[in-house]
Amino acid sequence: MKVVLVSGGVISGVGKGIIASSAGLLLKTLGLRVTAIKTDPYINTDAGLLNPLEHGECFVLDDGGETDLDLGNYERYLGIQLSRDSNITTGKIYKQVIEKERRGDYLGKTVQVVPHITDAIQDWIERVAKIPVDASGEAPDVCIIELGGTIGDLESGPFVEALSQLRHRLGRDNFLSISVSYVPIINGEEKTKPTQHAIRQVRSAGLIPDVIACRCERELDQATITKIARSCQVEDEQVIGVRNMDTIYQVPLLLEQEGLLKLLQKGLALDKCQVTPPMAQKGQALWDLWKKTVVPDRHLEPVNIILVGKYVSLDDSYLSVHKALEHSAMRCNRKLNLVSVDSEHLEPEMQEKDPRKFHEAWAHVVRAQGIIVPGGFGTRGIQGMVDVAKWARERKLPYLGICLGMQTAVIEYARNVMGLKGATSEEFSATAEHRVVIFMPEGSKEQMGGTMRLGSRTSHFKPGTEWSKLRGLYGGVDVVEERHRHRYEVNPDYIEDLEKAGLSLTSMDDQGVRVETIELKDHPFFVGLQAHPEYKSKTLAPAPSLLGLVAASSGCLDEIIEAAHKKQSSSNGVSDVTNF
């Protein structure tokens, strides 16, 4: 077992997740199998009930785990499938230890942070690091661990101590520590004091840094690198500058140029690892494809997409949607111009309350080449989502509704095409006459955490849907799997009437009862999914539905669908370099 720890000092939010993901990608280019773990010091069991405006999105995994958004970064960069146990929280660890104490597993001992909590953390890491994360079914060679928060925070203490002990247990050739720090520029001068203080804390915690990754706005001066190296007791080559790039997808290229891959090879004694020739070839092919895909987009033709949502004041609230659109734009050779619009600003009441916000919001809608409405909860801003779905439907503008976005599209269709006045969702009105969206029978209204329909679920395209653009984007297959996170569904009692009115319900669940996707046949691209396809989008393999939206908005949908069919017909029995 080999571990790469990525920790941070000074401040959070400096890019630990991207650096961790990039380090993992560089290791994969050598033909190694890589997994990832994120530790979070909060006491919540998982991210399922965290406010997206405070913490960012909740990222959902195949097994239904509701996790930190950084796990999405790992999956997107590394092309892997993680599990709920890949996200370790203080809440999970304490719950496990307390349950063991109640069972009597500790035989009457006084249960303490050291050794019981720290041992539990180490045991958890060693167990998860061995879980296969790709189609091969083989255990990973290297585990990337991102330490949430910053070293020195009170709540991070048990994790820091556990990782310090793990470093000692594994030995020098099996544990490499990357410390990420921020180098601010004040009056044109690169300031090194924050980094010096941060590394001093790291050292005092027992995590001697093997690499110091300095986040900065520009390329670091050699004098700054030398100063940091001397004050932190490392060599110059162990200090790498991670400057701002045009896109985050160029960070792996930058880190390779800065010498991180060589440091990883040396620090982990990777020359002793047995990498088969086929795996080495896959690694090189992956690197070649990455470099070809992530070219700068400055000279590409733009495509203007608007995201209409409830939590747009924080970009991280819809991080996976943003990334999936970026992946899709790269695939279509377009520069993504994404504008987020608060759905509440599109509502008639806003015209009286704040005319400027109302007109600005609708101006973005008018200029858009495509519209996406992602998931969400609650009644706020729903009318705005309904109105923008009507705009897209009537003006033949490419539209993609995800989860709540699909449900509001169904509500709009029921109201304005079927003539069902006041049609709505049971989430917004439990007594309305026409509840075209209802609470799922198996859901719980008493307990919120972990009670939704979560994780990977199967959708079956119905016979006669060969015309479906969405089905075409999947390569014309009969069955697909996407991740879900919802409590409400299209009311089965209205399925027949919706289809008679012209709304095609193109796929259903395993039982053929629950609506999974909707489409309009006579529209350039009007698609809704109950699933969250953004969670499975990869940098080198965009989510088909989001790729379809960008392609339709860019005028190349037919080309993309044709390519999907060709890939599907040629992929049988052929391994994918993006997934190993």
From Swiss-Prot:
Keywords: ATP-binding, Glutamine amidotransferase, Ligase, Nucleotide-binding, Pyrimidine biosynthesis. Pathway: Pyrimidine metabolism; CTP biosynthesis via de novo pathway; CTP from UDP: step 2/2. The active site is at 403 (for gatase activity), 532 (for gatase activity), 534 (for gatase activity). Its EC number is 6.3.4.2. The keyword Cell wall biogenesis/degradation does not apply. Pfam families: CTP_synth_N (PF06418), GATase (PF00117). PROSITE patterns: GATASE_TYPE_1 (PS51273). InterPro entries: Class_I_gatase-like (IPR029062), CTP_synthase (IPR004468), CTP_synthase_N (IPR017456), GATASE (IPR017926), GATase1_CTP_Synthase (IPR033828), P-loop_NTPase (IPR027417). GO terms for cellular component: cytoophidium; cytoplasm. It is an enzyme of class 6 (ligase). Transmembrane segments: none annotated. It catalyses: UTP + L-glutamine + ATP + H2O = CTP + L-glutamate + ADP + phosphate + 2 H(+). The keyword ATP-binding applies. GO terms for biological process: 'de novo' CTP biosynthetic process; pyrimidine nucleobase biosynthetic process. It comes from the Eukaryota. GO terms for molecular function: ATP binding; CTP synthase activity; identical protein binding. Residues 304-559 form the Glutamine amidotransferase type-1 domain. Catalyzes the ATP-dependent amination of UTP to CTP with either L-glutamine or ammonia as the source of nitrogen. Belongs to the CTP synthase family. NCBIfam families: PRK05380.1, PyrG. This is CTP synthase. It comes from Gibberella zeae (strain ATCC MYA-4620 / CBS 123657 / FGSC 9075 / NRRL 31084 / PH-1) (Wheat head blight fungus). The lineage of its organism: Eukaryota, Fungi, Dikarya, Ascomycota, Pezizomycotina.
